[in-house]
Amino acid sequence: MLLLVTLALLAGPTCRAQNILGNNVGTYFYVAGEEHGQLRGIRIFLTVIDLIKGIQLRFGGNWSDVYGSRSLKYKEFLLEDGEHVTQVSGTRKLCLTSLSFTTNKGRVVTFGVRRGLSFNESGGSDKYLVTVNGLYAPGLCLNGMGFKWKNIHDDFDDNDDDKEDDDDEHDDDNEEDHGDKDNDNDHDDDHDDDDDDKEDDNEEDVDDERDDKDDDEEDDDNDKENDKDDGEGSGDDDDNDDEDDDKDDDGGSGDDGDDGDDDEDDDGGDDDNGDEEEE
């Protein structure tokens, strides 16, 4: 079992180092960050005697970690829009002594000093450099380097896929917008229905108020007529009472006249009796 584990550990670096140019000894590294975009810049750290000590790549607008070692002495190369690395060459001894990068626009940049055994790597006319891997001796230098290439036509396929995805997302967004718009229209319809119901309620309330007002006015008119009738009835009764009182008074006065006549008759009788006595 221990033997199998040992073989597996040894096989890992060996397999990974098969495509590495230079010395196949040291600590393996792979420059990650390609998910952030295409290769847009290269920064190489150098030793005092211009050996390749460390490397850092820029993907899109992001710089990767430094693989190998940093140093105060470094050089960088930035790619223009639409520019890609199409070829890499270099020289090596125990360490990498130089690296040269050629672009599709014909520009060439060299890091370090060319000395030692040379090597050359190209993905072909229709490929460009994506990222690099390699081996390094910690604190000393880079021992070897490998290169990952990508077919330029894959970008068109990826762009088409991205465009289709964008179109699908756009369609989904449009459908969602239409759905939201329909919901808004339904909501507006509900508001309109609520407003109509509110107007109907207001009209009903106004009609009820008018009916109540008419009823109140009718009641007031009836009350006034009743009061008027009561007042006229009371006046007639008072007049009748006054007439009866006057009539009674007149009757009493007649009686008094009769009494006066009776008194006169009595006086006349007395006079006649006196005359008879004198005779």
Curated annotation (Swiss-Prot):
Gene: Sbp
Positions bearing carbohydrate: N62
Record region (Disordered): 160-279
GO cellular component terms attached to this protein's record: extracellular space
Composition bias, Acidic residues: 160-177, 185-279
Entry function: Spermine-binding protein is an androgen regulated ventral prostate glycoprotein that binds various polyamines.
Organism for this UniProt entry: Rattus norvegicus
Protein's name according to its UniProt entry: Prostatic spermine-binding protein
Residues found modified as Pyrrolidone carboxylic acid: Q18
Matches recorded under InterPro entries: Jacalin-like_lectin_dom (IPR001229), Jacalin-like_lectin_dom_sf (IPR036404), PolyBind_ProtTraffic (IPR052321)
TM segment ranges: none
GO MF assignments: carbohydrate binding; polyamine binding
